[in-house]
Structure formats: C-alpha cells, structure tokens
C-alpha cells in the first residue's frame, strides 16, 4: 500500500509516516522542506521517500508523486496566521498565546467568542492565510488526487475552534470539507481531532493538554455546559493516536465523511491491535 502524506515533516505528518513505515507501507512525504523539517534523525526516515515541492504554488506538481498511490493524507494546516512560525519557535509562545486568549474570552458575558468578525480576510493565493492553507490547498490537492485516480483522500480537519482564535480557522476547515465531499470517485475522510499534543516533539503542548483535559472532564460532567469553549472543552489527543486513526481510516473502506473524537480513539485502538 502506497500512501502520500502532505506535510509529512510536520507535527502530525511525521507521526503518520513513522507508523505507516512500521506497518510496511510505501510512504511518500510531500512538503516544501522535505526531510529538512525534522530535527532529529531516526532510522525509519531512511524508508520514506521525501519529496520537496510546493503544492500550493503548483498543485499539478503532485501528479507524478501520486502515481499508484492508494491514499493521500493531508496533515497540512495552520492554527494562527500572524507570526505563526515565531510563536511555535518560542517554547512559551503557544502556551501564553492560547491561555491569554482563553482567559480573555472565558469570562465575557453576552458574547459568543466564536462569532464571525465583521470583516473576513480576503483570499490570498500562495500566502499563509486560513483561506489559502486550510481551505484552498486542501480542495486543490483533493482534486489533483482524484485526477490521479487516487481512491482515498483523508483531510485532517478539526473538532472546533477555541475562544480567542480567529473563527476563520474552523470556518475554512468546514468549507474545505464541504467542497472535497463533492468530488466524485473519491472516498473523502475528515478527521476532527481536538487539541493534539506530544510531550517529546513539542513539550509545551503538554501544559495545554492538561488544561483541556480538566475542562473537557467538567464539560462532560455538566452535560456540555462548556461547549462554547470549542476545542478547549473537548478531550485532547496524543498526535500518535490521531496518526493511528488516520491509518485505520484510509484502510477501512467503510470509513468516510467526518470522524469525531470518540471514533478517532476507537480507530486508533483498532489499528494498534491489528499491528501487534
């Protein structure tokens, strides 16, 4: 089985590649940085075909890579637009940014923290915007996959937004889902995890995971009283668990459409059991 992972050198993507190699799959990673996006060299990386190309600039450049592929997994996405890379490079940046956003919105009354802003940013091709990355790139690569006769396209979407984050984040994810689902001859899958964490790859995500674990527990105990918090009220998942779920989803012909958190957990467990 050959799979093509868009964003294979990223936070989630490299977990998908690693687990797919362990399963014996032929794996191709596509990103603008190739294997250069990974800081630590590991043995499994030698078995991945690292393709360096810009699918946003030229989606058709994917066609040779997609030849004979059984599935495409798109793990590309952005959580923020402004200074996104700088925030991630600062170990305290993402935590302080999101916690400050949460604290500034959690206790406001009479407002919906996820309500759309009066103005929506204009679509900007080949730039780092929600419209360009979360929506347009996903749609275009799905169309190219169908053109290349790839039968399965798995898009890593999201459970919800979170207070303080631009509502365009989740809006563009849902728009991508709707358009991709219209593409004929393509089994489209939309994974909807909440917050993803990994103590080894990004230690700072552990702090947020602990916070969201508490808030999600309270939300369940209060029958959804904290639903307005979006992702902050949903159970966080390890990035490896989402990667396992992605591999199970593409290998199971019955899986299509949105896959929510509880289903992700079940699929991850199922794939892990089959791999033992």
UniProtKB/Swiss-Prot annotation:
Keyword Mitochondrion recorded: yes
Organism: Schizosaccharomyces pombe (strain 972 / ATCC 24843) (Fission yeast)
The keyword Mitochondrion appears for this protein: yes
A Gene Ontology biological process term: ubiquinone biosynthetic process
Record InterPro entries: ComplexI_NDUFA9_subunit, Epimerase_deHydtase, NAD(P)-bd_dom_sf
Function: Acts in the coenzyme Q biosynthetic pathway.
Entries under Gene3D superfamilies matching the protein: NAD(P)-binding Rossmann-like Domain
GO MF annotations, alphabetized: protein-containing complex binding
Protein family according to the UniProt entry: Belongs to the NAD(P)-dependent epimerase/dehydratase family.
Listed name of the protein: Ubiquinone biosynthesis protein coq11, mitochondrial
Disulphide bond pairs: none
Keywords assigned by UniProt, alphabetized: Mitochondrion, Ubiquinone biosynthesis
UniProt note: phenotype after gene disruption: Strongly decreases cellular coenzyme Q levels. Increases cellular sulfide levels. Decreases coq4 protein level. Sensitive to hydrogen peroxide, copper(II) sulfate, and mildly sensitive to thermal stress. Decreases growth on minimal medium.
A Gene Ontology cellular-component term: mitochondrial matrix
Location(s) in or outside the cell: Mitochondrion
Top-level taxonomic group: Eukaryota
């Amino acid at each position: 089985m050959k799979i093509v992972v868009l964003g294979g050198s990223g936070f989630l993507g490299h977990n998908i590649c690693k687990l797919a190699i362990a399963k014996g799959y032929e794996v191709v990673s596509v990103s603008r940085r190739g294997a250069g996006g990974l800081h630590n060299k590991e043995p499994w990386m030698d078995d991945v075909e690292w393709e360096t190309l810009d699918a946003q600039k030229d989606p058709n450049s994917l066609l040779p890579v997609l030849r004979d592929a059984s599935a495409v997994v798109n793990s590309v996405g952005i959580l923020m637009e402004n200074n996104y890379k700088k925030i991630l490079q600062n170990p305290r940046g993402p935590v302080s940014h999101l916690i400050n956003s949460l604290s500034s919105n959690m206790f406001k009354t009479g407002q919906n923290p996820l309500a759309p802003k009066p103005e929506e940013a204009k679509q900007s091709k080949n730039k780092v915007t929600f419209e360009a990355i979360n929506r347009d790139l996903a749609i275009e690569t799905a169309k190219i996959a169908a053109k290349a006769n790839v039968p399965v396209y798995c898009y890593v979407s999201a459970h919800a937004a979170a207070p303080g984050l631009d509502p365009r984040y989740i809006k563009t994810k849902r728009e991508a889902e709707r358009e991709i689902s219209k593409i004929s001859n393509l089994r489209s899958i939309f994974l909807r995890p909440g917050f993803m964490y990994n103590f080894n790859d990004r230690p700072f995500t552990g702090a947020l995971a602990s916070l969201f674990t508490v808030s999600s527990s309270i939300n369940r105990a209060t029958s959804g009283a904290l639903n307005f918090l979006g992702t902050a009220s949903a159970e966080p998942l390890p990035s490896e668990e989402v990667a396992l779920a992605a591999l199970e989803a593409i290998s199971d012909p019955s899986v299509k459409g949105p896959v929510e958190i509880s289903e992700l957990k079940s699929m991850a467990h199922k794939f892990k059991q089959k791999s033992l």
